[in-house]
From Swiss-Prot:
Keywords: Cell inner membrane, Cell membrane, Ion channel, Ion transport, Membrane, Metal-binding, Sodium, Transmembrane, Transmembrane helix, Transport. It comes from Helicobacter acinonychis (strain Sheeba). Na(+) binds at G77, T80. The lineage of its organism: Bacteria, Pseudomonadati, Campylobacterota, Epsilonproteobacteria, Campylobacterales. This is Fluoride-specific ion channel FluC. It catalyses: fluoride(in) = fluoride(out). It is a multi-pass membrane protein. PANTHER family: FLUORIDE EXPORT PROTEIN 1-RELATED (PTHR28259), FLUORIDE-SPECIFIC ION CHANNEL FLUC (PTHR28259:SF18). The chain crosses the membrane at residues 3-23, 38-58, 67-87, 102-122. One of its GO terms (cellular component) is plasma membrane. Na(+) is not transported, but it plays an essential structural role and its presence is essential for fluoride channel function. Disulfide bonds: none annotated. It is found in: Cell inner membrane. GO terms for molecular function: fluoride channel activity; metal ion binding. Fluoride-specific ion channel. Important for reducing fluoride concentration in the cell, thus reducing its toxicity.
Length: 127
């Protein structure tokens, strides 16, 4: 078996466990909101910050590929995929691909929300 898959799987298990833990530790009341997904919100922001650090370190070859697979793909992938979304957007902006970046941001948010709504509708009405 290729160890790359093992590293990604182990990191994913750790990241998913961390996401669950952070979600359980956060209150549901936040600022003026009676019910706010603070756990998910926090995980996404933490993941974006950490992938920014790791993305730069990876570009500078501070750590090896196996650790990158374990931590970036595995841990952060299990913790939040929003962090990858943030990194992909930043890379487009750094390459001055502004139309692509705007399309990616708007498309991901709008089509993602539509996908959630369609899935919800189908599950509600047909399952």
């Amino acid at each position: 078996m290729n160890l790359v898959f093992l590293w990604a799987a182990l990191g994913g298990a750790l990241g998913s466990s961390l996401r669950y833990f952070v979600g359980k530790m956060m209150p549901s009341k936040f600022l003026m909101f009676e019910s706010f997904p603070l756990g998910t919100f926090s995980v996404n922001l933490i993941g974006c910050f950490v992938i920014g650090l790791m993305g730069h370190l990876a570009a500078k070859k501070v750590f090896g590929d196996d650790f990158g697979i374990f931590f970036v793909t595995g841990v952060l992938g299990g913790f939040t995929t929003f962090s990858s979304y943030g990194l992909d957007t930043l890379k487009l902006l750094q390459k001055s691909q502004y139309i692509e970046a705007i399309s990616y941001v708007l498309g991901t948010n709008i089509l993602g929300l539509i996908g959630v709504a369609i899935g919800w509708f189908l599950a509600k009405n047909f399952v």
